[in-house]
Amino acid sequence: MTLSNNIKNKKDNWNYIWKKKSNQIKAKNIKDLLFLNGWDANLSKFSVKSWKNFVNYFISKNKINKSHTILEIGCGAGAFLLPFYKKNIKCYGIDNITNFIKICKNFMPKAKFYTAEANNLKIVKKIKFDFIFCHSIFQYFPSKKYANQVLKEVLKFKTKKNKIFILDIPDYKKKKNYISQLKRQIGKRKYKEKYSKNMHQFYNYEYFVKIVKKNNYKIEKLTKNLLNKKTSRYRFNVIIY
């Protein structure tokens, strides 16, 4: 999970939380990777089968095969990349949590993983990617300024043929409903303890449209609930092509 180094030493931020999470268990299977990636909360729980179906949707829909090279920005413990890797697809992953990168390398020794920030992708700048994924990371960015930097950096890799997927983006238009649901689910006290200093970033679809079209690329909104989890109704996905 990729966040800004500017805040990584403060305990009350997502970066600290993910560092702590990365050391909670010794991962032995994809279920453990999902736990380390934070998919254990009541609102975001789902089965391993649902997860595999979710990832395989992108593989089959886009006819991704072993001739392709993919990059995941904010790869966490590697749960999203693992199904690609098992199909002999060339995988690259970036995250700024060192322990997550170690876990990824352990599960996918032939893939390439790097410790880096999402807004500075120089380490892979010479590589041409057929597909780039940012799954469920934009909510953890410290500011819209940082998100702008990430989008600018990611779009440097855009070509006429490749695609960029930004997935599981919190919808600003549904923010109030999401917070209400969260409070009902975990209680107002726990909500305040957990989110008073670490609230997610929310985005309008128009935010992405403006930046993408400014760079003369096309963008598509995908609202279909591809993953069977409760938070999906408050999220959207974008495809840049």
Q: Residues of each region from the PLM?
A:
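A short, conserved alpha-helix within the catalytic core of class I
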Residues: 141-153
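Short amphipathic alpha-helix with an adjacent loop that forms part of the alpha/beta core around
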Residues: 121-127
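Short catalytic micro-motifs in class I SAM-dependent methyltransferases
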Residues: 136-140
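Short helix-loop-beta connector
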Residues: 63-68
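Helix-to-beta-strand junctions that scaffold the AdoMet/dcAdoMet cofactor pocket
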Residues: 141-142, 158-160
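Class I S-adenosylmethionine-dependent transferase superfamily signal
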Residues: 84, 153-154
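A conserved beta-strand element that flanks and buttresses the S-adenosyl-L-methionine
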Residues: 133
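Class I (Rossmann-like) S-adenosyl-L-methionine-dependent methyltransferase catalytic domain
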Residues: 2-62, 73-89, 95-110, 115-121, ...
